[in-house]
């Protein structure tokens, strides 16, 4: 398929284990219905016609992935991930080919709504820096005393946002910012933080709060509820 300006490659870092799920199986391979979380995640990305390819970064020798239908999907490319998320994302970017923009999405975030994805992708028409899906903070935020479960003070929530994924950036810009940040020992918690480190200010695109990341055991049932509701609404 010829690459055009509108083509987008998604990168899904899936080399992590997720110990907070308290399971022997990495969380991306836990099942919701008849599919794994990873399969739901990839399906949500490929549902948008602009996403023509998905690069999945997995742990070397990951036998669980090899057993999935995704392993033989014509739009899926697999690469070995690294020890840290940023290393896996860089490996995915290098395999993305000659696309102008890349979309990075958590492997364990299966409830991405198609409207959110479409609005995020639309910023490529107006932005040279990119942006992320995010949700305004709604709860009162407290900062704890260092190392203690005691309140130090209340944090003003005005202008505070929860960073979500996908995060969407020009491919070369994200590659260069991640590389520089890693080389200089910066703490990179998501892709946007690499751009921030290099002096850029990505856009915040408001997304749905039900775009949850499956992190703890109780998240699994919640994700199943959201996916079931989304399927019902699409078929209504």
UniProtKB/Swiss-Prot annotation:
Keywords: Isoprene biosynthesis, Nucleotidyltransferase, Transferase. Pathway: Isoprenoid biosynthesis; isopentenyl diphosphate biosynthesis via DXP pathway; isopentenyl diphosphate from 1-deoxy-D-xylulose 5-phosphate: step 2/6. It holds the Pfam family IspD. The record marks 20, 27 as: Transition state stabilizer. One of its GO terms (molecular function) is 2-C-methyl-D-erythritol 4-phosphate cytidylyltransferase activity. It catalyses: 2-C-methyl-D-erythritol 4-phosphate + CTP + H(+) = 4-CDP-2-C-methyl-D-erythritol + diphosphate. Its EC number is 2.7.7.60. It comes from the Bacteria. The record marks 157, 213 as: Positions MEP for the nucleophilic attack. SUPFAM superfamilies: Nucleotide-diphospho-sugar transferases (SSF53448). GO terms for biological process: isopentenyl diphosphate biosynthetic process, methylerythritol 4-phosphate pathway. Homodimer. Belongs to the IspD/TarI cytidylyltransferase family. IspD subfamily. PANTHER family: 2-C-METHYL-D-ERYTHRITOL 4-PHOSPHATE CYTIDYLYLTRANSFERASE, CHLOROPLASTIC. This is 2-C-methyl-D-erythritol 4-phosphate cytidylyltransferase. It comes from Enterobacter sp. (strain 638).
């Amino acid at each position: 398929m010829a690459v055009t300006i509108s083509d987008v490659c998604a990168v899904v870092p899936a080399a992590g284990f997720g110990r907070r799920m308290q399971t022997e199986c990495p969380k991306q391979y836990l099942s919701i219905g008849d599919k794994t979380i990873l399969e739901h995640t990839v399906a949500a990305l490929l549902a948008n016609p602009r996403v023509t390819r998905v690069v999945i970064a997995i742990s070397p020798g990951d036998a669980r992935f090899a057993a999935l239908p995704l392993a033989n999907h014509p739009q899926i490319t697999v690469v070995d991930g690294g020890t840290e998320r940023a290393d896996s994302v860089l490996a995915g970017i290098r395999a993305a080919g000659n696309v102008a923009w890349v979309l990075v999405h958590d492997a364990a975030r299966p409830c991405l709504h198609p409207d959110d994805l479409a609005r995020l992708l639309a910023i490529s028409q107006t932005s040279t820096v990119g942006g992320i899906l995010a949700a305004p903070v709604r709860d009162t935020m407290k900062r704890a005393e260092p190392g203690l479960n005691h309140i130090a003070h209340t944090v003003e929530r005005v202008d505070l946002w929860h960073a979500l994924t996908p995060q969407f950036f020009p491919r070369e810009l994200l590659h260069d910012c991640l590389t520089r940040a890693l080389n200089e020992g910066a703490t990179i918690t998501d892709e946007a933080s690499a751009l921030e480190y290099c002096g850029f200010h990505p856009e915040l695109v408001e997304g749905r709060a039900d775009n949850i990341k499956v992190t703890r055991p109780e998240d699994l049932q919640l994700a199943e509820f959201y996916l079931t509701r989304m399927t019902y609404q699409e078929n209504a």
